Regions:
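C-terminal substrate-binding/catalytic lobe of Rossmann-fold NAD(P)-dependent oxidoreductases
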Residues: 1-129
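NAD(P)-dependent Rossmann-like dehydrogenase/reductase catalytic/cofactor-binding core
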Residues: 109-159
């Protein structure tokens, strides 16, 4: 296994920025969620896999497994609304098979731009747990940058 210093901290902090908001000239991280992580690198050619454990805030009605899958299955983001060239038609794909998602099977789904999710089930310590995976280069670094540029152009921030 390879170890990269700072990777776990980054995976805990970056989503808080992404889901945060801009106030003045600063990004204010969201405080709606709490993330903890442990990163383990294994020798695969392409793909990142995450085991996710989640709980809902007190006072929030906990959705059922079926409701969560329905939300994921019907999710459409701004990239889909604008029909951007690099955007997958369906950003999230939920798999009902107990052994999915798998990197070799799903990494190139929708030209590598989709996120594959599966194994959503109740957890004994948290409300739910699930597994998700995406292509680290196509959805991640390179493809993510292209999609972001397409979005900036479509929204009028770039020519």
């Amino acid at each position: 296994m390879l170890f990269r210093s700072g990777e776990e901290e980054k995976s805990e902090q970056e989503p808080l920025k992404i889901w945060g908001k801009i106030e003045g000239d600063k990004i204010v991280k969201t405080d709606d969620i709490s993330i903890t992580s442990q990163c383990i690198r294994v020798p695969v050619s392409d793909g990142h896999t995450a085991a996710v454990f989640m709980s809902f805030k007190d006072g929030v009605k906990k959705p059922t497994v079926e409701e969560i899958i329905d939300i994921w299955s019907n999710y459409s983001g701004r990239a889909q609304e604008l029909d951007l060239p690099s955007a997958p038609k369906h950003f999230l794909h939920y798999f009902t098979e107990p052994d999915r998602p798998q990197i070799k099977s799903e990494r190139n789904l929708e030209n590598g731009m989709a996120v594959s999710v599966g194994r959503l089930r109740p957890d004994t310590q948290y409300d739910y747990k699930f597994v998700c995976m995406s292509h680290n280069t196509l959805r991640g670094a390179a493809g993510g940058a292209v999609l972001l540029a397409e979005l900036l152009c479509a929204e009028g921030y770039m020519d």
